From Swiss-Prot:
This is Lipid-A-disaccharide synthase. It is an enzyme of class 2 (transferase). Pathway: Bacterial outer membrane biogenesis; LPS lipid A biosynthesis. The lineage of its organism: Bacteria, Pseudomonadati, Pseudomonadota, Gammaproteobacteria, Alteromonadales. GO terms for molecular function: lipid-A-disaccharide synthase activity; phospholipid binding. One of its GO terms (cellular component) is membrane. HAMAP family: LpxB. SUPFAM superfamilies: UDP-Glycosyltransferase/glycogen phosphorylase. InterPro entries: Glyco_trans_19. Condensation of UDP-2,3-diacylglucosamine and 2,3-diacylglucosamine-1-phosphate to form lipid A disaccharide, a precursor of lipid A, a phosphorylated glycolipid that anchors the lipopolysaccharide to the outer membrane of the cell. Belongs to the LpxB family.
Length: 385
């Protein structure tokens, strides 16, 4: 354990899921180093623990190649400013949390300045653009991976990697309480609910709000008594979703909640959601789900040439087989979504739930504590790779 009176950590989290991981890591580090200082880019959870944000986390919350290109000048300005600030700060360690296209370039520059670097959340190098492993090897002293199969990939390429598990698997109980969640959200205890989660970023709602709303109309025809509930990450995303609802299904009633996505999923009988970390959360809450995703045509055509796997949702990747339906790009239509939701709501869920339970146990490792121990061991290490 480091004997310094005050450790300084620079950290960059790019979106909501990174803020959750960052806050968990901060809390674990503060157990042994209560005076530690944390600086960089973080979200509200990290800031609640004393994190000093130099830029708003929203600056990095972009998706798809087209959107990134349009924001590139600003992203490059943020990164160059961070390089200058962090180099002057001389932290004991820099921790880039996810956001690999932003953070790995930042880590490369900082490591060249003699700063120890950690990348928390392995980029999907096993799924697409596998040659990124060579840049990661140059940019980081250590990768903290959330998924068990990732470590073998890094070991094969002799890149230091520690499997820490996933904080969501630690936080979410093995059995989620539907009745309590409904009581908290003031939902009918006896009705059938479908949770609709179109994503947390503006670009995701731009692509998914319309097909999800139109699918809900079709689902209502199949299941006349079903009700819909949608958590939106903030007021801006709520307004965006309301516009889609008004434009495409003005008479459809969807109960909207600000935040509380986990409670909404726990309260639901089934879930329709965008691909991403939320699919892992839905798996851990153990509800039937349909995963859908759509990006701009250009982004899709470019990404398609780089993909190494034929699955994209975390439950299917973890299971190594298709346990939940995936509808991507041209298959992400209201008709196909509604049909898939109908199948999932009517099928025997017991075998899928059993697989979700197995995967939950696999990921339950006290991730924040393991990550903190790995970071502190690196801080104490005399030799760098």
């Amino acid at each position: 354990m480091s004997k310094k009176s005050q450790l300084v950590f620079a950290m960059v989290a790019g979106e909501l899921s990174g803020d959750i991981l960052g806050a968990g890591l901060m809390a674990a580090l503060q157990k042994t180093h209560p005076n530690a200082r944390f600086v960089g880019i973080g979200g509200p959870r990290m800031e609640a623990l004393g994190f000093e944000s130099l830029f708003a986390m929203e600056e990095l919350a972009v998706m798809g190649i087209v959107e990134v290109l349009s924001r590139l000048p600003r992203l490059l300005h943020v990164r160059s400013s961070l390089i200058k600030s962090i180099t002057e700060l001389k932290p004991d360690c820099f921790i880039g949390i996810d956001a690999p296209d932003f953070n790995i370039g930042l880590e490369l520059k900082l490591k060249a300045q003699g700063i120890k670097t950690v990348h928390y959340v392995s980029p999907s190098v096993w799924a697409w653009r596998p040659k990124r492993i060579f840049k990661i090897a140059k940019a980081t002293n250590m990768v903290l991976s959330l998924l068990p199969f990732e470590k073998a990939f890094y070991d094969k390429h002799q890149v230091p990697c520690t499997f820490v598990g996933h904080t969501l698997a630690d936080d979410i109980p093995l059995e989620s309480d539907k009745a309590s969640a409904r009581q908290l959200l003031e939902l009918d205890p006896d009705a059938e609910y479908l949770a609709i989660l179109p994503g947390s970023r503006g670009g995701e709602l731009k692509q998914l709000a319309e097909p999800f709303v139109k699918a809900a109309l079709l689902i209502k025809q199949q299941f006349p008594d079903i009700r819909f509930v949608t958590p939106l990450v903030n007021q801006k995303r709520r307004e965006q979703f309301e516009q889609a609802l008004k434009a495409h299904a003005p008479d459809l009633e969807i109960h909207m909640v600000e935040g509380k996505s986990r409670e909404v999923m726990a309260a639901a009988d089934g879930i329709l959601l965008a691909s991403g970390t939320a699919t892992l959360e839905a798996m851990l809450i153990k509800r039937p789900m349909v995963v859908a995703y759509r990006v701009s045509p250009l982004t899709y055509e470019i990404a398609k040439t780089m993909m190494q796997v034929n699955r994209f949702s975390l439950p299917n990747l973890l299971a190594g087989r298709d346990v939940v339906p995936e509808l991507i790009q041209h298959d992400c239509t209201p008709e196909k979504i509604a049909a898939a939701v109908g199948v999932e709501l009517n099928r025997d869920f017991a075998p899928i739930k059993a697989e979700f339970e197995r995967l939950h146990q696999l990921l339950r490792c006290d991730a924040s504590q393991k990550a903190a121990e790995a970071v502190l061991a690196l801080v104490d290490a005399k030799e760098l790779n």
